[in-house]
Amino acid sequence: MNPLKVLTISSVSIWLGAMAFFSIFVAPAAFTVLDRESAGRLVTTVFPRYYLFGASLGVVGLIGVIGQFFGSGGRQALWGTLALLLLMLGLTLYAMLVLEPQIQSTRLALRSAGIAPGSGVAEAQAFARLHRISVILNGVTLLAGLALIGLEAIRSRG
């Protein structure tokens, strides 16, 4: 198998594994074991690193796809893989650079005003909306990664 293809598949697979582990195990466990405030602080601390890790792996995967294209003299256009990887990377960068700072500022406003995140107050509703968007983007990124791995598996069968 082409080493650049291995690089792309490996980086996306590691990314998916990290996403699944954090989303399915770490975050829910934090909110089960810790009080809401402590769990929120833990997740707040992890998320910037989570997004940076994903974006870094996305760039590595992108290097693999671009390398495959140029290594084949342009004969091997991996448009589906490229589109899915760019979608994953774009959503992750948006979450990291735009959404996460908004969530943090909303969380700080809630904390400083003494408002509980689950209450019906406007700030709490804003936080819930931003959190919902974050969960959706994470889910779409995960599904795009699974589709990318599936597409590459189909292409390998040739």
Please annotate each region the language model reported:
Residues M1-G158:
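Polytopic transmembrane helical bundles with strong interfacial aromatic enrichment
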